[in-house]
Curated annotation (Swiss-Prot):
Residues 74-161, 468-491 are annotated as: Disordered. The keyword Ubl conjugation applies. Belongs to the AP-2 family. It comes from the Eukaryota. This is Transcription factor AP-2-alpha. Residues 468-481 have a biased composition (Polar residues). There is a cross-link at K231, K238 (Glycyl lysine isopeptide (Lys-Gly) (interchain with G-Cter in SUMO2)). The PPxY motif mediates interaction with WWOX. One of its GO terms (cellular component) is nucleus. One of its GO terms (biological process) is positive regulation of tooth mineralization.
Length: 491
């Protein structure tokens, strides 16, 4: 080396001042760091799992400083030694692994823990004393080796924190063969586990013993299969075997969750009564079930209006919780199935009361006689009287057949569910009409038809009077015949 160049000494802080100051500023610039990080793929925009963008100071500043320090330290032997990089960035970057191009016998690769999985130790397993029927055959089980980068000292420290050993693969929750099912605590009747609990149970009753089912107290109920009734499996124990035997069970071994449909759900004040005579009507569980079932399928808002529940912030939720207690299901966001009428707001007790009062008014206050006389005067022609009388008689007979049919209606109403008399086809149609009208329909129609029958009766009487007035001879003949009959009867 020429003496001129040999006398030149490279200062220690050449990267901090001098011609290489621009290089240090260039490496520490944030824009250049972002550009180089994106070019290297560290912060790819379209990657499925984008990594965190590293700060330029963490990526380039130690590298630039270490580069010039290495040139200063390795000027004599010409070898680039980069292990000093860890000393430069030791304070802010202690977790960075040391870089070295020379083989090291004590080198251990960094440990990257797997994704977090909850670990349950075997000592805390309450079913460890029970033979696992779903466990794999140990002869065919493939043991998984430990991670090569797991130090023994770190394993002992981690085991103290997690109360388990990560080296046992069969204890991990992800590899536990019993994770897909659970045993119910009811099966463990004694301290001996399943041995004493399942020994007394038949095989066909095992599915029923798994679930918690409350015992049925009323054995004489008969509930139709409706969608609003919650259903559950029947618990066939010895204590309630007699009670369950009398309950109708369908093919799926399910029964209605409503224990007593005749139980009073709430009392509702009437809408149509005056303030001086306010009356309350009792609403049974069966009536609430009919409001939630077809054809109406009322939602929580409409049902709350029928039951006169005050509007509140959590009114729908509280109503659903109250219905859940009696075994009725009212899903949130339900849409009504039928059009809302004025009869929808009436409970069945008030609707029947209204129909009864309507029938009483039709029976006592309808002007059947005045209407009959008025219409008969419009048909005073003697040639039409015979034909008209026959028409009135035929109409009266048809009305009688119609009222007799409605009298045989056995639709469920209130807490009564009578046995049907009519055929199922016509009875289902009448039941639909009564469910829509809350029990007002059939009695109201009967009251109206009864008023029509009263008109027909008065019309026939008026026609007889008109016929006798137009034919006085027939009247005298009839009177003579009647007098002769009376004399014969006296003799």
């Amino acid at each position: 080396m020429p003496p001129r160049l040999a006398s030149v000494k490279i200062p220690y802080d050449w990267g901090r001042k001098g011609p290489f100051r621009f290089w240090r500023i260039f490496c520490q610039s944030r824009a250049v760091g972002w550009f180089l990080a994106a070019a290297c793929g560290r912060a790819g925009r379209f990657r499925t799992q984008p990594a965190e963008w590293p700060t330029p100071d963490a990526v380039f500043s130690p590298l630039g400083l270490a580069l010039f320090q290495d040139r200063h330290d390795g000027a004599s032997n010409g070898t680039a030694r980069l292990p000093q990089l860890g000393t430069v960035g030791q304070s802010p970057y202690t977790s960075a692994p040391p870089l070295s191009h020379t083989p090291n016998a004590d080198f251990q690769p960094p440990y990257f823990p797997p994704p977090y999985q909850p670990i349950y130790p075997q000592s805390q397993d309450p079913y460890s004393h029970v033979n696992d029927p779903y466990s794999l055959n140990p002869l065919h089980a493939q043991p998984q080796p430990q991670h090569p980068g797991w130090p023994g000292q770190r394993q002992s420290q981690e085991s103290g924190l997690l109360h388990t050993h990560r080296g046992l693969p069969h204890q991990l929750s992800g590899l536990d063969p019993r994770r897909d099912y659970r045993r119910h605590e009811d099966l463990l009747h004694g301290p001996h586990g399943l041995g004493s609990g399942l020994g007394d149970l038949p095989i066909h009753s095992l599915p029923h013993a798994i679930e918690d089912v409350p015992h049925v107290e009323d054995p004489g109920i008969n509930i139709p299969d409706q969608t609003v009734i919650k259903k559950g499996p029947v618990s066939l124990s010895k204590s309630n075997s007699n009670a369950v035997s009398s309950i109708p069970i369908n093919k799926d071994n399910l029964f209605g969750g409503v224990v007593n449909p005749n139980e009073v759900f709430c009392s509702v004040p009437g809408r149509l009564s005056l303030l001086s005579s306010t009356s309350k009507y009792k609403v049974t569980v069966a009536e609430v079930q009919r409001r939630l079932s077809p054809p109406e399928c009322l939602n929580a808002s409409l049902l709350g209006g029928v039951l006169r529940r005050a509007k509140s912030k959590n009114g729908g939720r509280s109503l659903r919780e109250k219905l859940d207690k009696i075994g009725l299901n009212l899903p949130a966001g339900r849409r009504k199935a039928a059009n809302v009428t004025l009869l929808t707001s009436l409970v069945e007790g008030e609707a029947v009361h209204l129909a009864r009062d309507f029938g009483y008014v039709c029976e006592t206050e309808f002007p059947a006689k005045a209407v009959a006389e008025f219409l008969n005067r419009q048909h005073s022609d003697p040639n039409e009287q015979v034909t008209r009388k026959n028409m009135l008689l035929a109409t009266k007979q048809i009305c009688k057949e119609f009222t007799d049919l409605l009298a045989q209606d056995r639709s469920p109403l209130g807490n009564s569910r009578p046995n049907p008399i009519l055929e199922p086809g016509i009875q289902s149609c009448l039941t639909h009409f009564n469910l829509i009208s809350h029990g007002f329909g059939s009695p109201a129609v009967c009251a109206a038809v009864t008023a029509l029958q009263n008109y027909l009766t008065e019309a026939l009487k008026a026609m007889d009077k008109m016929y006798l007035s137009n034919n006085p001879n027939s009247h005298t003949d009839n009177s003579a015949k009647s007098s002769d009959k009376e004399e014969k009867h006296r003799k």
